Amino acid sequence: MVPAKAKKVIKVILIILLAAVLIVGGYVAYVMIDYHRIEDNQALQINDTTSDAALVDTEYKVISYNIGFAAYTPEFGFFMDGGTQSRAESEESVKNVISGVGDFLKSEAPDFILIEEVDKNATRSYHYDEEAALRNMLEGYDSTFTVNFDSPYLFYPLSKPHGKSYAGMLTLSRFNIESGLRRSLPIEDGFMKFVDLDRCYSVSRVSVSNDKELVLYTLHLSAYTSDGTIATEQLNMLINDMQAEYEKGNYCIAGGDFNKDLLVDSGKIFGIDGADYTWAQPVDPTLFDGTNLSMVAPFNEEKPVPSCRNADGPYNDNQFVLTVDGFIVSDNVTVSGSDVYDLGFKYSDHNPVYMTFKLNG
């Protein structure tokens, strides 16, 4: 016969276990019910400041920069990459990073800017509107903003949950953006879809003086996959879209974070073994077979600089680095140069990349 005192202890334990099951079950139900994909072929709002058209046979510069929601200072290691941190250090730190990013971009004065991982309203960045702040700093540009992360509240890590995020990609152009469109990409089918971004690319149609269009694509392809299969499917969709635009006579430039090893073997180039980082697979060159498109991987053979660090802890000289940020161009775009800015990962786990080019007349 079980003593009365023991029965009470067992009862309390069972109540605690039941409460825990109900809490966890309720949270899982909340995440699954709240989950949704953002509508495909969604027209984007254009912040219109200019009616100027881009010119042919004129050199322009485009910069792509994944700013890591303004959290990835050199001391930051992200929990999903093997680090411990889930939020920016503070709101003040977020503002300082955005200010630094804006100052850098203003000093370079590119004609086009593609920015990934920009928070509008997120727990992880203390609800600071990074998109509005950057637009206010970067005057004289038309712009579009494309949402690719509208997540439920992620209650992990328990000590400081990542929280809820509303974020996306910002595209800026010194020339008139006629229209903008959001295209949804294939994503993971399993659990990862609940914590990964709602992958997409934006399509911004820029006026050109010869009555054609420069079709500008801003992208952030999938990471956290075991073999890069989904990212390849995403890339294939983008290539097909760009090829169709080229065949209409338009100019095409895509840029952003491909989450692929654009240098094929960054580990060898930068002297740090990347065998354990299977998400960073090279781009399959056969994807471009039969197309009028080519990959542009930012690289200086004499002084190679990586565009990304694996944020499994604070930045250090032994951390795995690679180049995942770059561009795709159509054959009627002549590229004169492309490289990585060596900012030492001061503002993000990415360094910005650039490409100079001309639209062929």
Give short role names for the model-derived ranges:
Residues 192-193, 313-318, 342-346:
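Short proline/glycine-enriched turn/loop segments at secondary-structure junctions
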Residues 136-139, 164-180, 318-334, 358:
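Conserved beta strand-loop-helix elements of the APE1-like EEP
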Residues 166-169, 197-203, 321-326, 349-354:
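Short hydrophobic/aromatic beta-strand or adjacent loop that forms the aromatic wall/cage
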Residues 84-90, 118-120, 185-193, 220-229:
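Surface-exposed cleft-lining segments at the edges of enzyme active sites
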Residues 226-331:
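Metal-dependent phosphoesterases centered on the DNase I-like endonuclease/exonuclease/phosphatase
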